[in-house]
Regions:
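Conserved non-cysteine loop/helix-boundary elements of the Radical SAM core domain that shape
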Residues: 1-56, 62-81
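Terminal RNA-binding accessory module
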Residues: 72-136
Length: 139
């Protein structure tokens, strides 16, 4: 994918952010199924996700775009494999997201309420991007 950094460099930046900022939320985008992605590479991605413990992630499948260098690469990944890998990464990021959110249960946090939600609730985000819903009586 022509990234200009390694996973070790990325982890170093994440570690520095977590050391500098209490309760920082580290989120990411993760593409699965890029051409030539081997089982070994995918498994390394899963381990990396577990190790970094992202607060949230947008997981998506590579899709071939005509005229791009990646579209011309051999070993395009099958839709079934991309779907399976996507589900695995989503499950892992849901675990780490839940772990992150659960750290704040019972804590008082600042919330910016921006919109009404369903059933008469208000919805907002904390400083570290956790979605919160409360009843009107608490606003």
């Amino acid at each position: 994918m022509n990234r200009k950094y390694t996973t070790a460099q990325f982890k170093g930046i994440v570690d520095g952010l977590r050391e500098a900022f209490d309760d920082v939320a580290i989120t990411t985008d993760i593409m699965v199924g890029f051409p030539d992605e081997s089982d070994e590479e995918f498994n390394k991605t899963v381990e990396f996700v577990r190790n970094i413990k992202f607060a949230d992630a947008h997981v998506f499948q590579y899709s071939q775009r005509r005229g791009t260098p990646a579209a011309k690469r051999p070993n395009q990944i099958s839709p079934d494999v991309k779907e399976k890998r996507s589900k695995i990464i989503i499950a892992e990021t849901q675990k780490t997201r839940d772990e992150f959110i659960n750290r704040f249960i019972g804590k008082t946090m600042r919330v910016l309420f921006e919109q009404p939600a369903k059933d008469g609730l208000f919805e907002g985000k904390t400083d570290n991007y956790i979605t919160v819903q409360i009843g009107r009586a608490h606003v």
